[in-house]
């Protein structure tokens, strides 16, 4: 799996959240908030860490990934608390969630460039 494919999977969380909101179903907040469960996290804390932790762009990327999953966990807590309107509002543009994803996307691009991937 490429880094582009891995970050696309994290981007798909928004659709998953919107589907859960529409269906009014609960999600696994603990799993979504974990940084080492998704494909990008597995790469960052596996092969990526082994090969690229010396790059100055590695830690900011890992930090941005952690921040994104913190925000995703907050959205899921709202969904699971049946605060569907609040959860949906958290997914809008210029929210902490969307800014965290934007920062993650930029950090991954920088790491890819530095690592020549």
Q: What are these model-derived regions, one by one?
A:
Residues 1-117:
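N-terminal membrane-sensor/transducer module of prokaryotic signaling receptors
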């Amino acid at each position: 799996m490429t880094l582009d494919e891995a970050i696309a999977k994290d981007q798909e969380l928004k659709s998953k959240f919107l589907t859960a909101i529409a269906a009014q179903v609960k999600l696994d907040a603990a799993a979504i908030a974990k940084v080492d469960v998704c494909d990008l996290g597995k790469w960052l804390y596996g092969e990526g860490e082994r090969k690229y932790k010396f790059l100055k762009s590695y830690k900011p990327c890992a930090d941005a990934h952690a921040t994104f999953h913190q925000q995703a966990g907050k959205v899921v807590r709202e969904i699971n608390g049946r605060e569907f309107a609040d959860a949906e509002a958290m997914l809008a543009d210029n929210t902490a969630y969307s800014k965290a994803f934007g920062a993650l996307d930029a950090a991954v691009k920088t790491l890819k460039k530095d690592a020549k991937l």
